[in-house]
Amino acid sequence: MESNMQNLLEKLRPLVGARAWDYCVLWRLNEDQRFVKWMGCCCGGTELIAENGTEEFSYGGCRDVMFHHPRTKSCEFLSHLPASIPLDSGIYAETLLTNQTGWLSESSEPSFMQETICTRVLIPIPGGLVELFATRHVAEDQNVVDFVMGHCNMLMDDSVTINMMVADEVESKPYGMLSGDIQQKGSKEEDMMNLPSSYDISADQIRLNFLPQMSDYETQHLKMKSDYHHQALGYLPENGNKEMMGMNPFNTVEEDGIPVIGEPSLLVNEQQVVNDKDMNENGRVDSGSDCSDQIDDEDDPKYKKKSGKGSQAKNLMAERRRRKKLNDRLYALRSLVPRITKLDRASILGDAINYVKELQNEAKELQDELEENSETEDGSNRPQGGMSLNGTVVTGFHPGLSCNSNVPSVKQDVDLENSNDKGQEMEPQVDVAQLDGREFFVKVICEYKPGGFTRLMEALDSLGLEVTNANTTRYLSLVSNVFKVEKNDNEMVQAEHVRNSLLEITRNTSRGWQDDQMATGSMQNEKNEVDYQHYDDHQHHNGHHHPFDHQMNQSAHHHHHHQHINHYHNQ
């Protein structure tokens, strides 16, 4: 590290001189980062030797011991600088914290300085600071900062590359081959460090020739390389982290025995690449399973090519893939269960089992309810009010006489419907509510009967109520009638009186309809009897006794007997 600092100082020496900066000081950040300490300096008085070539001047003590030179004002300035500067406050601490160059123009200096205006520049570098000072006003020049940062980054780049190259050689070659290679690389390092320095180049030539040629792209590139190498310093072998060398992207690659400096290495640890790729694909590794899925690995062609190399990595990949598959299925199961108590695996499985049991119980209850409803419907659909005659249920016409009877066959269906209506007959419901002094709300629910709505309208009119709104709805054999009525001015009608009247009318309507049906059935039977008797007399009068006529007579008598039975049943 000391040699690197000295080399950096020699690279920065062209900046100082009689027509340039008075001195350049290199400050190094201490390990505890509480202060910066003196590492070295370049004095502008050394330029007098190169210009005069004689030793006429008296030599005095100067902190720049690289070259003996006459004592000048620059030496006086350097002698007043401390060996270390605390970083509690001040421009040094601010420069390191902000990592920004400080270009300061000062007007007050110590009494030993005659000039009243001076310029001080603090440039942050990895691990320290570079300070430039001049006893005159110097305009801010970015080229000076780029010049310092460029040499610092190149020096750090060379140092990191050499150290990593030596570490690779130590790890990859036998012990007997190390001595010659280390000597060869040491000589190359010495050649790089002993490059001819531009001591005889003046600062003006540097400003005019070299500095303007540095483009912004090169400056940014150097800064990026410096930051990257500065981060990689923690993984160098000198810090004891040899295992991390495989992850360092700036390992050197040798081609035909010639090391290539500063190029990223492609020879990284294959196992590390496999592990990193698997971690990126799976996201996380869940523990809790003890078997592996070998069938998936055998089907994967990617693993067949590596069958001779990474058996351990192959088993690890298979185990992780199997766990990922289980986790995906577990997540899918968790999304289907509505109630999850906890997010661990055992709780998810337990909640899923309980949910399945609840669904099974619910399905069983619905099945039982469906069976009960079907049994109830079967019982209600059986014929009611029938009569047994010689073991045969008689509910209408005899089946054997339907082809010979003059009565339509639809009569049997009407009788069945009438019998069902009788079995489901209900008590009428009447609700009457008085909205205000004259308006009433009337609701009548009863069985549907032909002419029932007309009779309700007539009843309301007879009570002195005028219907302003009416609504009727029928469902199966029931009908709901809703009326909004208004009484006349000269009528004194109460809600209870209206309800009782309508309830009596609906009951009488139901009974009257049944009586009408019975009377109609009786009249039809008498008419059929007269027709059959007239047909029989006509046959005897003509003297025809055809076998078919005899069968017709028997059927007519049988049907006449059946009609009497049916009439008896209706009564």
Curated annotation (Swiss-Prot):
GO terms for molecular function: chromatin binding; DNA-binding transcription factor activity; protein dimerization activity; RNA polymerase II cis-regulatory region sequence-specific DNA binding. The keyword Glycosyltransferase does not apply. Gene3D superfamilies: Helix-loop-helix DNA-binding domain (4.10.280.10). Residues 275-284 have a biased composition (Basic and acidic residues). One of its GO terms (cellular component) is nucleus. Residues 381-390 have a biased composition (Polar residues). SUPFAM superfamilies: HLH, helix-loop-helix DNA-binding domain (SSF47459). This is Transcription factor ABORTED MICROSPORES. It comes from Arabidopsis thaliana (Mouse-ear cress).
